[in-house]
Amino acid sequence: MEKWNHTSNDFILLGLLPPNQTGIFLLCLIILIFFLASVGNSAMIHLIHVDPRLHTPMYFLLSQLSLMDLMYISTTVPKMAYNFLSGQKGISFLGCGVQSFFFLTMACSEGLLLTSMAYDRYLAICHSLYYPIRMSKMMCVKMIGGSWTLGSINSLAHTVFALHIPYCRSRAIDHFFCDVPAMLLLACTDTWVYEYMVFVSTSLFLLFPFIGITSSCGRVLFAVYHMHSKEGRKKAFTTISTHLTVVIFYYAPFVYTYLRPRNLRSPAEDKILAVFYTILTPMLNPIIYSLRNKEVLGAMRRVFGIFSFLKE
């Protein structure tokens, strides 16, 4: 029996899972994914921290990606699981704001960080002689700090606006977390100006970085094609193809969701697409970056004593 005990200031999250055995099975699957994502990203952060061979700009950026993914999935899954198991779909006004802030911060910051990682690979492969100068430790810190700062500022602006618009009597958000576009459907005022700002924000933090990433990857692939060293060509292609896989899996559903007009969106489709960038991507990223990377596998063998059958 579902209990919807809530005050007039609370929101209701209608959720993702049906209240039956299928929902229980899917929840168990999501909890397993959450566990794998937590272990995988925590292990990646630990490896990069303790292994001196991974103390390079590329892996420093990768450790930040793992941290963002860890916070990303922790923002949505625990609350979704608690609501499903307890039957209480409510979330407080403040809790909704906090969840929305962290979700948007991770979303924007990760998009900018992926752009920084693509730029790092572009410099390493296309301008290897100047790489130590252009990609210094200070530059790496600035890129990471800029990603977090810009993501937080953008998130704060969206969250403050979403919490200050007047809402109608119904406060049932047809989503499994406090997604701002889903919250706007409950507004009692015209939100076309804000929807336009969402479009602009999505373009600045997702679409334009995606175009920049694909452009730099194209330059890298062109340079890789003209490499004389077969081993170097293989290593460079593996690195860039791995990053492209992560980028496409993250950006495609995000851009498709947030750049569509309201009349072309459906809550059911938005929730399914959100599963990709809030649940699946944080689990897949450490797997993709580790299984195709000999240096990471070697670090696992040295630090954790696993994969000892693999040669570095």
UniProtKB/Swiss-Prot annotation:
Keywords carried by this UniProt record: Cell membrane, Disulfide bond, G-protein coupled receptor, Glycoprotein, Membrane, Olfaction, Receptor, Sensory transduction, Transducer, Transmembrane, Transmembrane helix
Phylogenetic placement of the source organism: Eukaryota, Metazoa, Chordata, Craniata, Vertebrata
Extracellular side: 1-24, 79-99, 158-194, 259-271
Protein name: Olfactory receptor 2L13
Cellular location(s): Cell membrane
Biological role: Odorant receptor.
Family as reported in the entry's similarity comment: Belongs to the G-protein coupled receptor 1 family.
Cysteine disulfide links: 96-188
TM stretches of this protein: 25-48, 57-78, 100-119, 139-157, 195-218, 236-258, 272-291
Positions in the Cytoplasmic compartment: 49-56, 120-138, 219-235, 292-312
GO cellular component, one term: plasma membrane
Record-linked InterPro entries: GPCR_Rhodpsn, GPCR_Rhodpsn_7TM, Olfact_rcpt
Top-rank taxon, per record: Eukaryota
UniProt cross-references to Pfam families, sorted A to Z: 7tm_4
Keyword Iron-sulfur part of the UniProt annotation: no
Membrane protein topology class: Multi-pass membrane protein
Chief localization: membrane
A GO MF term: olfactory receptor activity
PANTHER family assigned: OLFACTORY RECEPTOR
Keyword Cell membrane: yes
GO BP term (any one): detection of chemical stimulus involved in sensory perception of smell
